[in-house]
A protein has these predicted regions:
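N-terminal "arm"/small-domain region of PLP-dependent enzymes with the aminotransferase-like
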Residues: 1-30, 35
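Short hydrophobic motif
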Residues: 6, 22, 44-45, 82
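Short, glycine/acidic-enriched loop or turn micro-motifs at the edges of active sites
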Residues: 9, 89, 110
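Phosphate-binding glycine-rich loop
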Residues: 30, 35-81, 95-99, 105
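Short beta->alpha connector loops at strand-helix junctions that form conserved
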Residues: 86, 105-109
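Conserved coil-to-alpha-helix start sites within the AMP-binding
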Residues: 87-93
Length: 111
């Protein structure tokens, strides 16, 4: 078999550092939140050139928080319509609904 993209070769260079972090997390017992999470959030915020970063468990949580933040900032409000592609993953819709908004389905155009 000819490998199209050798992920093993790429990940081998990161393996020692990643293994060390995994061991620290396992030994600490903090699988959610914890010091490693806070260190990552700080490093990622620095990398992005911003002051804050919030790690979430999945894309649905991320979308929900984004829409809730827009409401908090007054950019959107519950009941607003949010256009979503008709053929999408359910998290795209649930994030809108969780924030109290209404998804409006549309077919993308390739004009």
């Amino acid at each position: 078999m000819i490998k199209y993209f050798d992920l093993q070769r790429i990940s081998d260079s990161f393996e020692p550092e990643i293994s060390d972090v995994i061991i620290r997390v396992l030994r600490s017992g903090w699988y959610l939140q914890g010091e490693e999470n806070h260190l990552f959030e700080k490093a990622f915020a620095d990398y992005c050139g911003t002051t804050c970063c919030v790690g979430v468990g999945n894309g649905l949580d991320a979308l929900t928080l984004i829409f809730m933040a827009y409401c908090e900032l007054g950019e959107m409000q519950p009941g607003d319509e949010v256009i979503v592609p008709a053929n999408t993953y359910i998290a795209s819709i649930l994030g809108v609904i969780r924030a109290g908004m209404r998804p409006v389905f549309c077919e993308p155009s390739l004009l």
